[in-house]
Amino acid sequence: MTQDLQQYIHRFTHLRRAPQFGGAPHKPVLLLSIFQLFSKGLVTQNRIPVTAELVYFFKTIWKQLVTTQHLPVVNMPFFHLQSEGFWHLHAWYGKESELSHCRDIGSINKLNALVEYASLDEALYELLTQPITNAALERTLLDKYFATTEAQYCPDALTTVLDDIVIKPANIPQVPIAVAGAEKAVVEEDNFARGSLFKTVVPRIYDFTCSISKLRLTSTVQNVSMVDACHIVPFSESHDDSIGNGIALCPNLHRAFDKGLIAISDDYTVLVNKHIAEDKSSAFNLSQFAGQPLKLPYSENLFPTLENIGAHRKRWGY
């Protein structure tokens, strides 16, 4: 066993934790989540931002291991883990002073507004990139903090992010005004995870191609795509970030769809509003798409649902 590994095993078994309910599980669960990001190739450099995958892994591991009355919020351990000395927060440009004077983070939105990413001690980072030492540190946390529930730990379940977060219809309510504090933070984090994955996954399952115009443009130099993840029923009304409420559209057609200038029939062809006046000689006219079939994802269970496209038509009087 290397000296570095021994050092971090000692530090991981002596984490500073709030004593309530026998000790807060947040830091160990966050570390387990980070280990899985490494194992699954989702971290390839020593920069760990708050991502939808991290939030999802945290929530899933929490359900597997935690039996106390603590609430599963990521923002608290992500911020307070810096007290352990091996976790370092890096502020967005211009936010350095605000972060240095911050003593607590009340929500994931505030965390993302202040912190660009976290980094690990270089020695710890190197340990986590190696499967054997990664597994040894993982086992250390499980044995120390979750001895009675570690049999429920199933990291393979984390590969179902698309099914659990995006494909299945959302059942996440709008944050009620009366809900505050940690309970509100839980709902905000769930919404963050779904929303972030929606924006990432929808363009991907449409092969970064506009479903209506078939425009496809990507860049090998920059992370650029000319399609948006468009909600069919507005998120402000439905709070639905599932794939069945999404479609990939280029920006001009996204706007036209949101304004009801175009819609989708139950056979997945394009409808154009009969009450618009346009120059049909223009290469950008909407009428050219009338009756055209959509480009759809590779699997029918990823198609926009008939319920959602029907609600969109009804909204705009088709």
Task: Locate the predicted segments by residue.
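Active-site catalytic microenvironments for nucleophilic, acid-base chemistry
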Residues: 37-40, 216, 252
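An acidic intrinsically disordered interaction segment
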Residues: 1-8, 216
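A detector for short metal-coordination/catalytic motifs
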Residues: 193-195, 218-318
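Short, charged surface segments at domain edges that flank catalytic/cofactor-binding sites
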Residues: 140-141, 152-217, 233-244
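Short helix-coil boundary/hinge micro-motifs
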Residues: 5-169
